[in-house]
Structure formats: structure tokens, C-alpha cells
Amino acid sequence: MSYTLEHIVKQLGGALRGPNREVSRLAPLELAGAGEIAFVASAKFRRQMLESAADALIVTEALAAELPDRSLIVAADPYLYFARLATLFHPPKAPRAGIHPRAVVGVGCRIGESSEIAANATIGDNVVIGERCRLMPGVVVGDGCEIGDDVTLYPNVTIYHDCVIGNRVGVHSGSVIGGDGFGLAWDKDHWFKIPQTGRVVLEDDVEIGANTTVDRGALVDTVIRKGAKIDNLVQIAHNVEIGEHTAIAGCVGIAGSTKIGARCTVGGAAMFVGHIEVADRTHIGGGTLVSKSIKEAGNYASSYPLQSMKDWLSNAVHVRHLDDFAKRVKQLERELETLKKSKEEPHE
């Protein structure tokens, strides 16, 4: 599949500068060649831009002035333009309408005529599935679930009973939506399991990565709000709420009843204790332990930066003696204060 730059601009906007070439592929800036188009995210890639052999480049207005003889698409945000162009070149696969003979569908289900239910998918009783959905092989949907339009459940996704999935949601392979939350009460010498009676609600335009788990609520629902993006291997515990358009990177753990606001970003391997709240537009660095509520938007981090093993071991030794250091500093402060007083006292 190939497109002229003129066609691309008509579809996606932007401004065409230079010759109207035809391109068939997207490629990284430093590797792009004939028939390929690349984007320049910012001026820090100026050298790679000037050396690039790409047939066309997506650039800002400021950078376009440095490339008077090249084929360009000028855009306010080249990275966003690249994302939309990638979708033009690689549109989502349309469902093949129908229910495969080897799929299992329970009683009382309502499934949109344009949706695809693949081989070995299992759908419980009284499930509602909208139009243009794709349920791939090995998907399991429990009783009473509601699934909107244009939803894709990749192979071996499990949706437990009574969960609600909005429109244009994607859940990737191996993820489990609606498993029991970790609710236990201590009874003398053993744990007593607390029934988890809430649901999981994934609102419109949510995407869940591979092997991620979202636990159902104990009494109220666990809710992932509109447009939130969750990466692979993320654990979201019961009663958690993730705000609209928040993005969470891989290997994050969020303990129960925590609420993360809208339009936040969370770096990989960050951990959240339970029963805290995080303000809208908060940005958490990778590896951070969030141990208390964050009431003001901003950038937060608590992980040590990378250093050599030798330096780390040396610093670790000092950390072990921080209490001794603190006592010595206090003693020095007392001695300094005594010395000051002695100098201030009149001498006979």
C-alpha cells in the first residue's frame, strides 16, 4: 500500500512542501530510505534529519526552513502526525462477522451481527456484545457481561462475570478482568475469604496490555475511566479508580481502594499503597513508591538514579550509618552552640 504526500495531507491535514512523492512505508529517521517517510520529533534530532535518506519527512514549521529542497509534511506535532499516519498505513483489521462453529455461546446472549466470535471462544449466559467486536480464540466471557461496540479481545483474555466493557476497548492476550480482589479477614488462626461482589468497569477507549490483571471490587466497582491506557503486567487491585486518559507503564502495582486522577502518567515498576488519592495531571517516575496521597499536580519520583556498583556499595555503607551520623551532627551542633556562647560572654 502506498500513498502520495498530497493524499496523506488531504486525509490527515498538515501542509505539503516540496515535490509530491509517493511513500509506501514508515521508518525510523536514521534508517529511512527510498519510498519511506520518517518524522522529526524535535530540533535535537537535527543532525539525523539533515543526514536522512528518507524520501519524505514530517517536520515542524521551524525545521522546514532548514530543508528547502526536500519533500516535507509540515505539522504542529510531528509525533502525533506520525501516529495518525501509522494508522492510515495499518488500519485495524475488520471483524469477520459470525460465530465460529467451535465457539461456545450460552443462553440468552445478544451478539451484534457484525461481530466475530472465533474458534474456542467461550461466552457465558446472558452476555451482551455490540457491533464490530472481535473475540479471538480462547477468549472467555463470563455470565452477565456487557460489551460495547468495536471491542477487541485478543487470544486468551478472560472477562469474569458481570463486568462492563465500553466502546472501542482493547484487551490484550493473557489479561484477566474481574478476578477476585485480595479481600481476607483474620479468624483466630486462619484467613476467611471476603466475597468480592463488585464489578470491573472499563469505560470507552480504554486499552489494557498483555498479562495485566484488574480485580473486581469488594462492594463497589473497580473503574478504569475513559481513554486510560494500561501497559503489560500491571496489577490493579479491588476498588481502584483510574482517571480519564491516564497512562500507566508496565509492571506497576496499585493496591486496593487507591484513586489515581485524570491525565496522569505512571512510569514502569512504580508501586502505590492502598487507600490513597493522586491528583489529576500528576506524573510519577519509574520505580517510585507512592506511600501517601498526592494532592498537588506535578512530577514525583523516589527511585535512586543509576550508578556504578562500586559507588552504590560505598553509598549503601553510609546509609547504614545515617543514625550515627545524625547523632554526631547533633553533638557537633551542641558543641558549636556552647563555643558561641563562651565567646559571647564577657571576660573578666
Curated annotation (Swiss-Prot):
Residues passing through the membrane, by range: none
Protein name stated in the entry: UDP-3-O-acylglucosamine N-acyltransferase
Species of origin: Chromobacterium violaceum (strain ATCC 12472 / DSM 30191 / JCM 1249 / CCUG 213 / NBRC 12614 / NCIMB 9131 / NCTC 9757 / MK)
Positions of the catalytic residues: 238
PANTHER family (alphabetical): UDP-3-O-ACYLGLUCOSAMINE N-ACYLTRANSFERASE (PTHR43378), UDP-3-O-ACYLGLUCOSAMINE N-ACYLTRANSFERASE 1, MITOCHONDRIAL-RELATED (PTHR43378:SF2)
GO cellular component: membrane
UniProt function note: Catalyzes the N-acylation of UDP-3-O-acylglucosamine using 3-hydroxyacyl-ACP as the acyl donor. Is involved in the biosynthesis of lipid A, a phosphorylated glycolipid that anchors the lipopolysaccharide to the outer membrane of the cell.
Enzyme class: transferase
A Pfam family: Hexapep
Similarity section: Belongs to the transferase hexapeptide repeat family. LpxD subfamily.
GO biological process: lipid A biosynthetic process
GO molecular function: N-acyltransferase activity
Pathway stated in the Swiss-Prot or TrEMBL entry: Bacterial outer membrane biogenesis; LPS lipid A biosynthesis
UniProt subunit comment: Homotrimer.
